[in-house]
Amino acid sequence: MENKNTYNELLYKSNPFHYTAPALLEAYGRLYGLTPKDSRKARVLELGSSFGGNIISQALYNPEAEFIGVDLTAEQVKKGNEVIEKIGLQNIKLIEKNILDINEDFGKFDYIIVHGVFSWVPDIVKEKIIKICNENLTEEGIAYISYNTYPGWKEADKIREMMLYANKYFPEVSQGDKVQRGKAFISIVAEQMKIYTDVAEKKGDFIKQIEGILNMQDYYVGHEQLENINDPMYLHEFVDMLRKENLQYISDVGLRLSIASVYNDSTIEKLQQLSQGDPVIKEQCLDYILDTKFRRALICKGSQAEKLNFSETFPNDILDSFLLTFKYTKEEVETLNEENVKAIMLHLIETPNKSFTIQDALKYWEENINTEDKNQEKTNEVLANLRKFVLNSMINAKIKFYCSENEMVPYEENQVYVPEIFRNYIRTLIVGEGAGIIGIGNSRNEIINDMNNVDVIVADILSEPKTEEEAIKELSKTNIYRTMQDGEGVQITANEYFPESIKKLEFLGYFAKK
């Protein structure tokens, strides 16, 4: 791919992205009526995998699954494989390969992930990516492709064009210098626009977009704004490409871009009139209304099309089967109108990282919420309200849903330990070969930013079960500093820090029982 050299020149940190996790893609497939492979035992291919940061964490938590990453950049593939070897993972490898050279002999995969690649490659590579999603996807497999989208990118195109113009006469400077020059240029433009009231009022959103880019990290701006290719397209154009390869568009990962039922009645009615039941037309119209800038498409084989449920009404047994996790704050739950649902959710939010099912929520109501009219009719009413609330929350990305999850062993003094593979993982990514280039992810592929070298020490101390007294005594040999708001480091005791570290390790699911 043509942008190979710039990826070497301006390092793009390889992070996990939760919305690409096979466990999530599996759940979306089941929501829409498909029967994808159990993600814990699947074969997964990522195109444009860089150092492997998006799939290394998944390989860590899913030892029975197999992960293959493909990238053209030799240095990143080599470094990523060194990190994988250091961690000790046996179910993942990165391959230096041109996407154009992949054919059916490369094998079949249950999930194919293409994140942050599609809009930045020539048309011939785009077409090949789509072809791979046909030829190398299992019959019931699911592919994920993200891409920049019109109409939302129309304004962003102007900013990109300004930054490219700022570097027009300096083709030989480094990518990092181009980013700084481009940022300086658009900063001046925004400042001057603000001087003139009529312009500032008319182009307020545009100015905010510029300010947003000025606050972004250089590696992201360099690849988003200054690559030779950044080629947004409309949803309908993307779907046309899929159809040429007999692929079927399912939905966007952002369900608000696919399911209209959460909008007001007028919007729903007009979308129905415009689309006449065609889900792609409906979503394209939503993009015009919402000025959509980015999409994360889910795709399956054309042979699966007749299984898909586009009715926006999903069977109760499917909703009830999902493991759910909260993204609500307590303040948001307090605003709920339905009192029984509010009471249930206020209880569940006390353990926000613990998953639950709709039936778990109903059971809590049956056993703990006192109402005078508690009978079967009332139970059915509460259950219906719960399902409605959960579905709306799923669409609005306030509840995440999965088909399965990793066992989370709680911390017990002198009863649990941290297995070697997890200790190797955080050590390698925090103080070892992967430090600064690969982000840490949890079992849901969410990026974790609060781990540090002291947590590595705590994990190593707990390589065997220990009493807290023993563990803290060992930890007290380490100088521990907490960075305050003013940037100053304040020393704290092992007694203070140990419980904090335990919470982190527990949340990550690192504990096991002997």
Question: What do the PLM-derived regions correspond to, one by one?
Answer:
Residues T73:
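Conserved SAM/SAH-binding beta-strand->alpha-helix loop
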